[in-house]
Amino acid sequence: MPLRPIVAEALGTALLLATVVGSGIMAERLSGGNVGVALLANAIATGGGLYALITMFGPISGAHFNPVVTLSLTGAGLSPRGHALPFIVAQVAGGVLGVWLAHLMFDLPILQASMKARTGIGQWAAEATATFG
């Protein structure tokens, strides 16, 4: 398999996670405690960033940026089976690097534990909707 699509998946996933996490950090800092404003700012930044990344990397790798997307497309026969494992490894590595980049940009510890509880049926329903919806 050529290296270019693998690099596109790693870089695209890293930039996507840096955008999602970075805009979330910035929105929380600037929103003055207004969660609705913070979520709106994060959603707009994420949507714009995702559009740009798909436009840039779509022609190179298909712009999966998510292991579930890769597995779904592979299972449906829309992506070659030989691409699945390299793409997933690239996506996981890119995701970690993207979060680290966001933390670096905002002078936060590279590794830190979340102070927010992220559990329960609502969280799982949101994740399922975002992933499979």
What are these regions (language model features)?
Residues M1-G133:
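Membrane-interface helix-loop junctions and terminal tails of multi-pass membrane proteins
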